[in-house]
A protein has these predicted regions:
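Short, hydrophobic/amphipathic alpha-helical patches that form generic packing surfaces
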Residues: 51-65
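Short terminal alpha-helical segments
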Residues: 1-45
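Gly-Asp-aromatic-enriched flexible segments
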Residues: 36-40, 49-50, 137-139
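Residue-level signature of the C-terminal ends
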Residues: 24, 63-66, 103-106
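Helix-loop junctions that connect tandem helical modules in alpha-solenoid scaffolds
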Residues: 42-44, 84-88
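Residue-level detector of well-ordered alpha-helical segments, enriched
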Residues: 28, 48-55, 92-95
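Low-complexity intrinsically disordered segments
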Residues: 90-139
Length: 139
């Protein structure tokens, strides 16, 4: 995992997914949620899918009035272009919250969990994801 910090956009997978969202809009969100559903059925979410889920949660929280101010510059343009289409996805908040919970569940289910646990930075990463989940829940 190419990561330089524990933040939602502090790794290559997250930035790649954000670029996909910028290009594809809501279709990228639908795609990552479908990939999460497939992964959960198989019992394991790989780090690329998990990173996409984290970024989708950031985008959704921001679009519903609970942004992470530190990310405004990075997500603002893509969100401005695709916000309406993103919010039109059925059950988006419920599905994204469920996916985020799976990413943060355990090392048996989530590669991101496993990688962060091995890195020695798990507590900081998990705290950041829990804070994101709280913002998403409040949104």
């Amino acid at each position: 995992m190419g990561a330089w910090g524990v933040g939602s956009l502090d790794n290559d997978g997250s930035l790649d997914w954000l670029a996909d969202f910028g290009d594809m809009g809501a279709a990228a969100a639908v795609e990552v949620l479908a990939a999460t559903d497939e992964s959960l059925a198989d019992g394991y979410i790989d780090s690329d899918v998990g990173s996409g889920v984290v970024v989708l949660a950031e985008l959704l929280a921001a679009s519903r009035g609970k942004p992470n101010p530190a990310l405004n510059d990075q997500i603002g343009e893509a969100l401005a272009r695709h916000k309406a289409d993103l919010l039109a996805i059925d059950d988006l908040k419920l599905r994204t919250t469920k996916a985020l919970d799976a990413v943060l569940s355990d090392a048996e289910t989530s590669e991101l969990y496993d990688l962060w646990e091995e890195s020695g930075e798990f507590d900081a990463w998990a705290a950041q994801v829990r804070e994101l989940r709280a913002r998403l829940e409040a949104a």
